[in-house]
Regions:
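A polyanion-binding, active-site-adjacent surface
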Residues: 6, 14, 18-166, 170-173, ...
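Generic N-terminal segment detector
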Residues: 1-10
């Protein structure tokens, strides 16, 4: 990974230019290349920054923070909770769909591809952007956390009226990075069936759209059945 070869949207590249040149990112690259040499890494290189490329910096309306990419073959696509069309919908995403159904009356889609949301301004960001095959959280110590924290901090500083959906304790740990005076921070338990606490009934999707409308922004169409 070299900065001149990293394909990332221009707004994000400018916002994160200091981070890309930092000692931390040098450590990320070193750890990443070592992991690649040792075995299979997900997602494919071209999709590592997919969240930033599908949702330009100046277009972000909502942030949904995940932990790390899916570690099964063909699952990870660089968007938190999302899997490519045709791949079995993972349990956490199935629960997200159930909450949207209960919150907004939207029928559960048969695809796990969330690109439709990303293209409307939903930044689907994992705190860690890579993983070794079959080893959940295997890259959590690579320095990605500091990189994605910088992205959240820059959004908080430069953007206005963004909705941050933080599910589970690792996501909630990012709260200090966000200026709650000019953004909406929504918290709940993680949607995983294994998580403790309440995710169902959080109504984050309707709350997000209400907040966006109150601040003169077009709401998100959460209905993935409308995706072409």
């Amino acid at each position: 990974m070299q900065i001149d070869k990293i394909q990332i949207e221009a707004g994000w590249k400018e916002a994160l230019k200091e981070e890309f040149l930092s000692e931390n990112f040098a450590r990320v690259k070193e750890n990443f290349l070592r992991a690649k040499a040792a075995g299979e890494v997900y997602p494919p290189n071209a999709l590592i920054f997919n969240a930033f490329n599908l949702t330009p910096f100046n277009a972000v309306k909502v942030v949904i923070l995940g932990q790390d990419p899916y570690h099964g073959a063909g699952q990870a696509m660089g968007l938190s909770f999302s899997v490519p069309r045709g791949v079995k919908i993972p349990p956490s995403l199935a629960n997200i769909y159930k909450e949207i159904r209960d919150d907004l009356g939207i029928a559960e889609p048969n695809s796990g591809d969330l690109s439709y949301w990303a293209k409307q301004g939903v930044l689907l960001l994992n705190a860690t952007l890579s993983v070794s095959a079959g080893q959940a959280n295997s890259h959590s110590g690579f320095g990605w956390q500091e990189f994605t924290s910088a992205a959240i901090r820059k959004l908080s500083e430069r953007a206005q009226n963004v909705v941050f959906m933080l599910w589970g304790n690792p996501a909630k740990a990012k709260i200090p990075l966000i200026d709650a005076n000019k953004h909406l921070v929504l918290t709940a338990a993680h949607p995983s069936p294994l998580a403790r606490g309440a995710f169902f009934g959080c109504r984050h999707f309707s709350k997000a759209n209400l907040y966006l409308a109150e601040h003169g922004k077009a709401p998100i169409d959460w209905d993935l059945n409308n995706a072409v």
